Amino acid sequence: MSNPQQLRYSKEHEWLSGAEDGVSTVGITEHAANALGDVVFVQLPEVGDSVTAGETCGELESTKSVSDLYSPVSGEITEVNEDVVNDPSLVNSAPFEGGWLFKVRITDEPADLLSADEYTAFAGA
């Protein structure tokens, strides 16, 4: 399992892209997607919602369990990926590409985000 080097990671197993015009893309890691099993339902925040780093902002339901989705940063939701709402299996098949979850205009970024190498060591992935 390979964690892209250009991303940063949370200990709740979300990834965060580098900000473009202050907006970053968020998804869950391949490690988290594999642990969940087949994702069958995705509940995302709505455009315009405020999210807080480390707080619940949605839900992922799989054939194994229901898991909370956490925001790795604080900010305002600017876009949600309707493709994963309509086809939740994208979370499993392409967690770092088409399976991204939402975009957020960052107002605060915690200092404890991990590099790819740090996340790999943390997750044992």
From Swiss-Prot:
Check the record and name the InterPro entries matching this protein.
2-oxoA_DH_lipoyl-BS, Biotin_lipoyl, GCV_H, GCV_H/Fam206, GCV_H_sub, Single_hybrid_motif
Q: How is the cofactor bound?
A: Binds 1 lipoyl cofactor covalently.
The UniProt transmembrane annotation reads: none
Cellular component, GO annotation: cytosol; glycine cleavage complex
Cofactors, names only: (R)-lipoate
Key words of the record: Lipoyl
Any one Gene Ontology BP term: glycine decarboxylation via glycine cleavage system
The UniProt subunit note reads as follows: The glycine cleavage system is composed of four proteins: P, T, L and H.
Query: HAMAP family from the xrefs?
Result: GcvH
What this protein is called in its record is Glycine cleavage system H protein
| Origin species | Streptomyces coelicolor (strain ATCC BAA-471 / A3(2) / M145)
